[in-house]
Curated annotation (Swiss-Prot):
It catalyses: XMP + diphosphate = xanthine + 5-phospho-alpha-D-ribose 1-diphosphate. Homodimer. 5-phospho-alpha-D-ribose 1-diphosphate binds at A128, N129, G130, H131, A132. Pathway: Purine metabolism; XMP biosynthesis via salvage pathway; XMP from xanthine: step 1/1. Converts the preformed base xanthine, a product of nucleic acid breakdown, to xanthosine 5'-monophosphate (XMP), so it can be reused for RNA or DNA synthesis. Pfam families: Pribosyltran. It comes from Pseudomonas aeruginosa (strain ATCC 15692 / DSM 22644 / CIP 104116 / JCM 14847 / LMG 12228 / 1C / PRS 101 / PAO1). This is Xanthine phosphoribosyltransferase. It is an enzyme of class 2 (transferase). The gene is xpt. NCBIfam families: PRK09219.1, XPRTase. It is found in: Cytoplasm. GO terms for molecular function: xanthine phosphoribosyltransferase activity. One of its GO terms (cellular component) is cytoplasm.
Length: 190
C-alpha cells in the first residue's frame, strides 16, 4: 500500500534496528483518512471470506479494525489488556508479551461477544514475533470461532511472526512489509 509506505517514510522514526515509531499517524495520533484507506484495503482483501467479526487488541489495533469493520459491515471486538469492573465474568483470557514494552499482559474478551458461529478477521497495527497475534488466536480458539486470516498494518518481515503464523496455516495480509530498519532507514520488502 503505497500511501502507507510513503507515510512511514515521511513520518516514521527508526528508534533501533527493531523498533519503528509511528505515533504520528497510527498508535498515538491517528490519521483518519489513512486509517479509512487501511480499512478499505483490508476489506478488499477479505470481503469474500464471510467475516462476521473483527478482533484486535487495545489500543493501537482499534483504529484500523474499526475502519475495516465499517467497510465490511461487521462488529469489532478489542481484547482488553486488563480486567475492569465491567469485564470480569465469562471471559476468554490469554497472555501476551509486548516486544516494544518488554512486558507481559493479560488480555480478555467477553464470551457474550464471540462464539463458535463467528468467522473472524484479526487485525493489528504491527506484526513482529507474532506474540499478540497468537494471543488473539488463542482467545478466538477458546470461543470455538474460526479465523479467516490476519490483517497487519505494518509487518516487520525481518522478524519471525509471519513464518510462525503461516506455519500454522493462517493467512497473513500485510499492507506494508518492512525488510530492514538498519542504519536508521526503513527498507520495504516489496
Amino acid at each position: 500500500m503505497d500511501i502507507l509506505k510513503d507515510k512511514i517514510r515521511s513520518e516514521g522514526i527508526v528508534l533501533s534496528e527493531h523498533v519503528l515509531k509511528v505515533d504520528a499517524f497510527l498508535n498515538h495520533q491517528i490519521d483518519p483518512q489513512l486509517m479509512q484507506q487501511v480499512g478499505h484495503a483490508f476489506a478488499t482483501r477479505f470481503r469474500d471470506q464471510g467475516i462476521t467479526k473483527i478482533v484486535t487488541i487495545e489500543a493501537s489495533g482499534i483504529a484500523p479494525a474499526v475502519m475495516a469493520g465499517l467497510e465490511l459491515g461487521v462488529p469489532v471486538i478489542f481484547a482488553r489488556k486488563y480486567q475492569s469492573l465491567t469485564l470480569k465474568d465469562n471471559l476468554y483470557i490469554s497472555k501476551v508479551f509486548s516486544f516494544t514494552k518488554q512486558t507481559e499482559s493479560t488480555i480478555a474478551i467477553s464470551a457474550k461477544h464471540l462464539n463458535a458461529h463467528d468467522h473472524v478477521l484479526v487485525i493489528d497495527d504491527f506484526l513482529a514475533n507474532g506474540h499478540a497475534a497468537k494471543a488473539l488466536i488463542d482467545l478466538i480458539g477458546q470461543a470455538g470461532a474460526s479465523i479467516a486470516g490476519l490483517g497487519i498494518v505494518i509487518e516487520k518481515s525481518f522478524q519471525d511472526g509471519r513464518a510462525l503464523l503461516e506455519s500454522e496455516g493462517y493467512r497473513v495480509e500485510s499492507l506494508a512489509r518492512v525488510k530492514s530498519l538498519a542504519g536508521g532507514q526503513v527498507e520495504f520488502l516489496d
